[in-house]
Curated annotation (Swiss-Prot):
NCBIfam families cross-referenced by the UniProt entry: PRK00823.1-3, PRK00823.1-5
Catalytic activity: (4aS,6R)-4a-hydroxy-L-erythro-5,6,7,8-tetrahydrobiopterin = (6R)-L-erythro-6,7-dihydrobiopterin + H2O
E.C. designation(s): 4.2.1.96
GO aspect biological process, one term: tetrahydrobiopterin biosynthetic process
Family of the protein in this entry: Belongs to the pterin-4-alpha-carbinolamine dehydratase family.
Enzyme class: lyase
UniProt keywords, alphabetically: Lyase
UniProt cross-references to InterPro entries, sorted A to Z: PCD_sf, Pterin_deHydtase
A molecular function GO annotation: 4-alpha-hydroxytetrahydrobiopterin dehydratase activity
Protein name as annotated: Putative pterin-4-alpha-carbinolamine dehydratase
């Protein structure tokens, strides 16, 4: 990563991100998305993967059928940064376009 990002307060980050939550054991954001079917979930992940490569910031995520669980943190900074907020906002937009329902449920 060429640019140094400063860690930000989780409450500030969460204020800009509806339905995202603080991870219970880490300095990270988390969210669960539910799609109509696997193809929609996989399409969402493919779109996010291209964006992640573009900004050189990659989510921790898992996919089970129509569900995608996401954790965002910036390892180099030891917590949440503007990169995570930017990724979360992009993910919310991409998920909405794919017809997803965002659920603020504990992921782990």
């Amino acid at each position: 990563m060429s640019q140094r990002y400063l860690r930000m307060d989780l409450s500030i980050a969460l204020g800009a991100l509806p339905q995202w939550q603080a991870h219970p054991t880490r300095q990270a954001l988390q969210k669960r998305y539910r799609f109509d079917h696997f193809n929609a979930a996989f399409g969402f992940m493919s779109r996010v993967a291209m964006f992640a490569e573009k900004i050189d910031h990659h989510p921790e995520w898992s996919n089970v059928y129509n569900r995608v669980d996401v954790v965002l943190t910036t390892h180099d900074a030891g917590g949440v940064t503007e990169l995570d907020v930017r990724m979360a906002q992009f993910m919310d937009e991409a998920a909405a376009q794919a017809g997803a329902t965002g659920l603020s449920l504990p992921v782990y």
